[in-house]
Amino acid sequence: MAFFRNYSNDTVSHNVLDENEERQNAATFQSSPLNEDVDGTYSERGFDMNMDVQYQSDPEPGCSIRQPNETAVDNVADPVDSHYQSSTKRLGVTGRWGSTFWKDCQPMGQREGSDPAKDSQSGYKEAYHSEDNHSNDRSEKLDSENENDNENEEEDNEMNKHQSGQADVPADEMLSDEYYEQDEDNQSDHVHYKGYSNPTNSRSLPKAGSAVHSNSRTSRAIHKNIHYSDSNHDHNGDADMDYEEEEDEDDPEDADFEPYDAADDGGASKKHGQGWDVSDEDPESDEEIDLSDYEDDYGTKKPKVRQQSKGFRKSSAGLERKSFHVSSRQKRKTSYQDDDSEEDSENDNDEGFRSLARRGTTLRQNNGRSTNTIGQSSEVRSSTRSVRKVSYVESEDSEDIDDGKNRKNQKDDIEEEDADVIEKVLWHQLKGMGEDVQTNNKSTVPVLVSQLFDTEPDWNEMEFLIKWKGQSHLHCQWKTLSDLQNLSGFKKVLNYTKKVTEEIRYRTALSREEIEVNDVSKEMDLDIIKQNSQVERIIADRISKDGLGDVVPEYLVKWQGLSYAEATWEKDVDIAFAQVAIDEYKAREVSIAVQGKMVEQQRTKGKASLRKLDEQPEWLIGGTLRDYQLEGLNFLVNSWLNDTNVILADEMGLGKTVQSVSMLGFLQNTQQIPGPFLVVVPLSTLANWAKEFRKWLPGMNIIVYVGTRASREVCQQYEFYNEKKVGRPIKFNALLTTYEVVLKDKAVLSKIKWIYLMVDEAHRLKNSEAQLYTALLEFSTKNKLLITGTPLQNSVEELWALLHFLDPGKFKNKDEFVENYKNLSSFNESELANLHLELRPHILRRVIKDVEKSLPPKIERILRVEMSPLQKQYYKWILERNFHDLNKGVRGNQVSLLNIVVELKKCCNHPFLFESADHGYGGDINDNSKLDKIILSSGKLVILDKLLVRLRETKHRVLIFSQMVRMLDILAEYLSLRGFQFQRLDGSTKAELRQQAMDHFNAPASDDFCFLLSTRAGGLGINLATADTVVIFDSDWNPQNDLQAMSRAHRIGQQEVVNIYRFVTSKSVEEEILERAKRKMVLDHLVIQKLNAEGRLEKRETKKGSNFDKNELSAILRFGAEELFKEDKNDEESKKRLLSMDIDEILERAEQVEEKHTDETEHELLGAFKVANFCNAEDDGSFWSRWIKPDSVVTAEEALAPRAARNTKSYVDPSHPDRTSKRKKKGSEPPEHTERSQKRRKTEYFVPSTPLLEGTSAQVRGWSYGNLPKRDAQRFYRTVMKFGNHNQMACIAEEVGGVVEAAPEEAQVELFDALIDGCKESVETGNFEPKGPVLDFFGVPVKANELLKRVQGLQLLSKRISRYNDPISQFRVLSYLKPSNWSKGCGWNQIDDARLLLGILYHGFGNWEKIRLDESLGLTKKIAPVELQHHETFLPRAPNLKERATALLEMELAAAGGKNTNAKASRKNSKKVKDNLINQFKAPARDRRGKSGPANVSLLSTKDGPRKTQKAEPLVKEEGEMSDDGEVYEQFKEQKWMEWCEDVLADEIKTLGRLQRLQTTSADLPKEKVLFKIRRYLEILGRRIDAIVLEHEEDLYKQDRMTMRLWNYVSTFSNLSGDRLNQIYSKLKQEKEEEEGVGPSHLNGSRNFQRQQKFKTAGNSQGSQQVHKGIDTAKFEAWKRRRRTENDVQTERPTITNSNSLGILGPGPLDRSHRARQTGFPPR
């Protein structure tokens, strides 16, 4: 009855059915062929209702929040929409139905006895059959799907029945999954400690969002041309539609370009395009498009039909992984190409409906699985940015969608692409506080102001904390109501206000204690909001560029408390506060490049050299291991060396987790085996395991692999595999996951060869036929470790299952094993000895009292309490089987008494566990006597109340355990009414919330008094040692579970004596079971049960088994019953006796249990596996005595290290210059080169001609300030090599001195520019001297390549560093550079690389001593002092640092330029670096409109005459690859072609601009209008192209080529390729000619078109390859298509023998036999 949690600031992103989507969904069927007779015309009557009615007419509380059964409306749009559409058809109106839908909706409170999952199913089913009624033509297609749906509904009903009864079932009868190993898909999202849990409370606000997200992967767009669908893994990894494939699918009868007269326009549209002659001027400009008729009734923008896709997908090889959202306001834009032809659509209808039916089934299943809990918590933050909610509007019928249904209200401009979209409303506060935060530069994190929830606020005076769609919580903003009302998603704000208003009204009825509890839950909500802005982990990086072209490193951030699917790309300056996480990521990337050692080699080597660990290893840094833990580590190490798989069976609380983690640390650090290791644990202990890994082994790359399918796929993409060709193939060291994920992703995980497998709570493997058992047994593992605190509580068969899992070869035959040890219960000495012998190598078992003497004692008291009168009444009814009274007033599941013992145990706990008692006696929540009724109805609660009051006064903290979840609900309600702060953890609590609850309870200043736990929830790792009192409210059937519960508090770290109070109802079945269990069951549970695998009793020679036979059960039931029936019915006297109980008297009278874990027999059996006996028989006494000196070990390690080759420089050696042999025509010199040449001639005008130095290719001899002495020229050149930036001209001049220092600053800059220009000219003229191009700089030979690279690198470095406020802590290198040979000796890492570059910028390249002495850089102890010689130090000296720094600068250049630095790119490295150097220094050309022109690739020119070719190792070209010469020429030619096309089409620039804008606005316009506009634009452009071709060329062959060049230029303004545009235009022209009855056009007629098609096909067959597919970071899809074109694979091109003989069109038909594919065009 958790009323507080209901009103925590739960995000409302998915709670509301977006009205816009309703309209879109309705449109789907209205526009289908079945409904073409419906008048689809938009008219004012469709929108004449009051816009404010929807929000001002406040329905019953909670109406704005959907019930779970409405989830299907979102996800299965078509079938459900048809249900609502029928009413619309009868009215003859295709307008909105949203308002009436909301008015007619039922109150959102859960109906008594109803199951929301069933409601969901029935609602879906009703809608689905309604679809059949209205769509008779489709009924046959859906029959089979309906049958399947019915079958699935039956299955779901069974599941719901199971769930509805789950709370009543005691813990021992439920599977462990239902307690603490439930997967995240079917868990409650709330923390029970935060309030009541009343299923009938009308104020409960169930959240449907979880069902939406649980289906995020199955809810895939079924339209085959939705480029952003989640179809990567189902369709060969394609992220986008391949347009060339679409060409193959297109039909000559393509309906995409039908005239604008679609039937579904209701006759309101005009018939356009009556004649072929279309005006070149667009009669309706884009600015004149008016969509006012299609406005939403409340003035907000409709969200896009398809949201931004998950950016996390494995894309095609070689593609850069793109951003989810680069622009903070980016919205998805769709192109007209997203629609299929009508013919394709009709053919695919059947498939689409089958797909919908299947998805509907999946949705119902998921809805049925979701636990029905109260008030979903805001911790669940599945972002709709990355876990996309798919609208099923885009089905195969989308061609007929009514225009207006897909439109948005465009208030100002149709191209308003940067609008904000509200994803979540997180909090609210008084207006102005947000501005104050910004003014004072404070954090935007909200604070809890209790006044906000005391009175109903004026929402106009409030501001809201908004999480924007596509952005992280880091970018949340405070916005007022007026700021938000015109934004998409505004309805979420309205629903948030309704929710808060209802909560405020409800708080007025609460007591002060309840309000305090409510405030605590809100503080925890705020904690989670803060958490979501904290960086948990960086999982990827990339290089992007800002608007100025500057390099911006970006990181993919996984946020604290959010899943991998909600990771976002962030700029490095935005997450500067998380520099530690960035450095950890960089360090992980470095470690991946290091290959590990082989297991068998290290095992053999370790046997000979390894000694026992007497001290804790230095790599284990989280604390100090205790002696027995170090002994346990030695046991694990010894077992690994002997290749023995083992069970670590220490008692609860002895630190098995730490010992296991240490073993993996030993493999990674001591043995250099980096994994991969697999650790499988229960969900409840997952967070604790991760925390222990981070604490003890912070250097280990541990992946927590859980979550939804989308999250796990993101994790696989970025965290699993190393795609680089160097290093190990698996990135992570250890993978931490749960049992359920292992089963779900068995196909993925089984492919990995695991070095070590650990299974926590290994009794999950006791059934050798279970799925988990068989799955893990199939995994490829070198060694295994099972971790369990209760290794021998199982039967002989189950013990064999564990041993068989460890060693299938040794323990093959189960029957033989069982036969050998079937008489263990008789304690046959020979059998025990044999068992010890077999198990000794495999088990290590210690108990607390043997090894942990310092742990305070625990005292257990059994408190026997009487039953209350109501309990006695129900106890009698159960014994009498009085169903009439037991089920009085019950509407749901009735008491069946199938298990009468369980029902009696429920009665002993609390009669309110029976619905009839709760309904009849419980009272209303607002009743003042509610607390008294709860307490007095149960004798146990009476004693608990007295006990807790006493413990509260004496400052104790309490753990309360119960088996029954419903009992925990009652206890939670009691604690809330009492005003006691508490936390709660049971099987339905999500993993992250479990950890949060434990952390909150264990916090030093925590005010939590109680912690409610399910007896079995958790396992190893739930450490609540801050509590010193344990209350076992009801004893478990298995005493071992109660012992485990006690160990939650009585464990290492406990400082106080632990008092344990076990409640037992006297004279009841409970007391008798406890007594009999003490006498008969304890030994069996602790040693070996006497049950076989089927759970039946086996025949025994001696003792009976643990199950009770018929006579025993009868005796148990009779116990106390006689006295109960003899008692006089005097309820008042019984009540007085209960109230008069004195707690002190009860405690004195309590039976005290001595602290004996086991008896002597059990001790004897398990004693064989204690510390002293962990070595197996193979070990002799001298194994650990093979002492060798530690120094010798280090020496041996260094001697055995692989002899790595010396690092070769990864940058380009200037001695391998480019071998370009073609000269550029004089007339075709680029304008920037011409300007520079004129500048050079101007500077040289003053000086008489001086002969060039020998071997130089260019000369700088003139300076406006006068002559430069050779000595100063030498110094100037060297100093420029040091600083490289004219911004540091003062430093350069000061260091040079002489004439340069005396010259004015303008002259200094002029000299700097002259040096750079001269080097460029030297490179361009292509000198082939052995040392590369050399410049004659005032008589000083300057290596041009070397200087240009240095200057370019230093300038890039300066620009990058200038972005940071604190460069020393924030600046990092862009990419990883392999460590040098000397790195290991001084501990050099990537941070030192960054500091070295900073020192170079501050002090100059080569000034190593200044860099060393700069204390801020922290390199004093990592660089050798200048006075030390090579043999005197292992630290890097000047040559080492120069080599490292040069390589780093080149790596920075390569990363910033987007070049591939992998080995496969090395073939063209030297040439491309050279070209890049030239182009980087050129100012971007500007075209006539002032826009940035393409980055020109200059054709290198040389002097006339024969060349002296430098002999060098030839670069081998792969087959089909173009030569360097031909490639450069082709690039130049294509660039000139583009300039020419731009000139001749300059008159059509307006049309081209409109075509480009249409790419980004087509999603907002009706499809027919889009097609009409495209047709018009293509007709205008096509006619102009035809005229240009006829004007310029007479040769048909060249006409074809010129036509394609022009269309390729047009394609830079469109999403389609030039070939596709040409094909569409030709088809349009042909159709127009056929309509007019005219023969082939005189302009490029049909014969020419056929020849074009034939020629295109031939060209494509030789050279065309598929376009790369990927998601780019740009805002518009048009830009994406164009950028993707840049990556087109180039086909083979002929070597041009003499470029002077070629015209601008290149060689004619005789020069080449095939059409060369053009290189990619730069974006315009």
From Swiss-Prot:
Q: Where does ATP bind?
A: D650, E651, M652, G653, L654, G655, K656, T657
State where the protein is found. Nucleus
**Matches recorded under SUPFAM superfamilies:** Chromo domain-like, P-loop containing nucleoside triphosphate hydrolases
- Biased composition, class Basic and acidic residues, residue ranges: 126-144, 403-412, 1227-1237, 1504-1520, 1669-1691
Gene Ontology molecular-function annotations: ATP binding; DNA binding; helicase activity; hydrolase activity
Instruction: Locate the motif Nuclear localization signal 1.
Output: 320-327
List the ranges annotated as motif DEAH box.
760-763
Q: Where is this region: Disordered?
A: 24-88, 104-415, 1199-1245, 1480-1524, 1654-1724
Domain named Helicase ATP-binding: which ranges?
A: 637-809
Annotated Polar residues bias? 25-34, 362-376, 1658-1667, 1692-1702
Annotated InterPro entries: CHD1-2/Hrp3_HTH (IPR056302), CHD1-like_C (IPR025260), Chromo-like_dom_sf (IPR016197), Chromo/chromo_shadow_dom (IPR000953), Chromo_domain (IPR023780), Helicase_ATP-bd (IPR014001), Helicase_C-like (IPR001650), P-loop_NTPase (IPR027417)
Domain of life per record: Eukaryota
Write out the residue ranges of the motif Nuclear localization signal 2.
Answer: 1224-1231
What positions carry the motif Nuclear localization signal 3?
1348-1355
Q: Which family does it belong to?
A: Belongs to the SNF2/RAD54 helicase family.
| Name of the protein this chain belongs to | Protein CHROMATIN REMODELING 5
Source organism of the structure: Arabidopsis thaliana
Tell me the gene name.
CHR5
